[in-house]
Amino acid sequence: MIENRPWLTIFSHTMLILGIAVILFPLYVAFVAATLDKQAVYAAPMTLIPGTHLLENIHNIWVNGVGTNSAPFWRMLLNSFVMAFSITLGKITVSMLSAFAIVWFRFPLRNLFFWMIFITLMLPVEVRIFPTVEVIANLKMLDSYAGLTLPLMASAIATFLFRQFFMTLPDELVEAARIDGASPMRFFCDIVFPLSKTNLAALFVITFIYGWNQYLWPLLIITDVDLGTTVAGIKGMIATGEGTTEWNSVMAAMLLTLIPPVVIVLVMQRAFVRGLVDSEK
């Protein structure tokens, strides 16, 4: 029997409340700043009571963009969505098919190919990113959705996770499919894919947020303002030198940028947790 200790319960709940406050307070300050005008934001100290300029600030960046030479913010949101969704579908497709081939097909050096994929995790981003930019430039894919998404569609982690899951599937499934005359792709579509739905949900959430939060890659690949993404666009709103940053517009843009990943997490929360739990079994 677990002994009930009131002081321990009080302490744990106090720490939980403090942790939540530490996380939510910066978000609340950002929300308040997004509701104020420029003068109120620069007042010292800035008020913590929400103002009435939220819709005005959102409309300003939605129509006029986040800077003097930028696309409207709705365009940046669209670009970020296209990038995140394309990367997500690409990662899932490439990772599932490569893991399926490594596990279920018998061909020479298949384990070597897997470890060659897996060893890329040991390479820092700084080592990989500039050669990748050089390849994209040589292929004439700068300032394009293809250059923005294709290099990020390969994932060693996703391939590893799917490989580990596929290795837990019983061999009897393969034998039954062979007896029924199913081709490898029929076996993949009718048996392997449905059994992988929980893992797919978890990977979808993780990969979408990964693609949505990309900052360095779009900054290196994109110079066309009409192809800019939200995260890079917000960075462009912060003035350097003698310029003045309109923090109310920056915070309004940040709030809009938070909405899509938050919606994805809330909608797929149960499937995401189930996918993480099932992948550990």
From Swiss-Prot:
Domain of life of the source: Bacteria
PROSITE patterns registered for this protein in UniProt:
ABC_TM1 (PS50928)
Q: Which SUPFAM superfamilies match?
A: MetI-like
The lineage, from the top, is: Bacteria, Pseudomonadati, Pseudomonadota, Gammaproteobacteria, Enterobacterales
Q: Give the gene name.
A: ugpE
Q: Where in the cell is it found?
A: Cell inner membrane
Q: Which GO terms describe its biological process?
A: transmembrane transport
Q: Which UniProt keywords apply?
A: Cell inner membrane, Cell membrane, Membrane, Transmembrane, Transmembrane helix, Transport
Stored InterPro entries: MetI-like (IPR000515), MetI-like_sf (IPR035906)
Q: How does it assemble?
A: The complex is composed of two ATP-binding proteins (UgpC), two transmembrane proteins (UgpA and UgpE) and a solute-binding protein (UgpB).
Q: How does it sit in the membrane?
A: Multi-pass membrane protein
Location of the ABC transmembrane type-1 domain: 77-268
The protein's name: sn-glycerol-3-phosphate transport system permease protein UgpE
Looking at the keywords, is Cell membrane present? yes
Q: Which Pfam families match?
A: BPD_transp_1
